[in-house]
Amino acid sequence: MALPVNKRVPKILFILFVVAFCVYLVPRVAINFFYYPDDKIYGPDPWSAESVEFTAKDGTRLQGWFIPSSTGPADNAIATIIHAHGNAGNMSAHWPLVSWLPERNFNVFMFDYRGFGKSKGTPSQAGLLDDTQSAINVVRHRSDVNPQRLVLFGQSIGGANILAVIGQGDREGIRAVILDSTFASYATIANQMIPGSGYLLDESYSGENYIASVSPIPLLLIHGKADHVIPWQHSEKLYSLAKEPKRLILIPDGEHIDAFSDRHGDVYREQMVNFILSALNPQN
């Protein structure tokens, strides 16, 4: 027997409420599984680091470090490298991967995305893009930095954020782009982590959409073939979509974002430095 109309309406409204709640909640739960921020201190701050507090365009308060060249004044550095770190921990965990750069006469600017380390807010695709773009602008406006000699260095998800920034047309002063262990597609990686969850992430932020727009800025991609977090084929795909000038380095025994760790010594560090020098002096 059919329910009277006055009894069916509350039931229908309840079902609609549950559906709407799931539509609202499920993507947010998926995002929480996708990002792995924490505020643990993994090591001491770099002794020469200047703590930098800045604000993203949407008002979120963020934390960064400016580490000047250790071989001379910051304004005489070869270039300033803006580092966008990976998807776990915070910049104190990632500092060892770039700690070798100041002694080679590079300034380094590191920062934590919203929700990571001491930065406020909650991670999101749009938020991390905002944070990365805001960090680049902070460096551009420093009086001790040559704003025409900037290098973007993104590891893992940091590379995706850098590509999205480039895709927004933000190119002023950027002389080289370096991507380490970066994925081509958010959906593909999300499905790898949680099967079927890829549709919950916005593919418009995926690096494969923007990699071609990096040119004519020189592009270096590097990836370990033993990477069990992001398969190396992602970098191979990005390389195939990119335009010249471009270079791809595949490390036979390389793991996730370990190309510049002590495990490989100076092998890939020197290749990165030589790539930057070539990008800054293309006539040589």
UniProtKB/Swiss-Prot annotation:
Main location per UniProt? Answer: membrane
Q: Which residues form a coiled coil?
A: none
GO cellular-component terms in the record? membrane
Q: How does it sit in the membrane?
A: Single-pass membrane protein
Q: Which domain of life is it from?
A: Bacteria
The alphabetical list of record keywords is: Membrane, Transmembrane, Transmembrane helix
Has UniProt tagged this entry with the keyword Chaperone?
no
Where in or outside the cell?
A: Membrane
Q: Which InterPro entries does the annotation name?
A: AB_hydrolase_fold, Hydrolase_4
Give me the segments passing through the membrane. Answer: 12-32
Indicate the family of this protein.
Belongs to the serine esterase family.
The name this protein goes by in its record: Uncharacterized protein YfhR
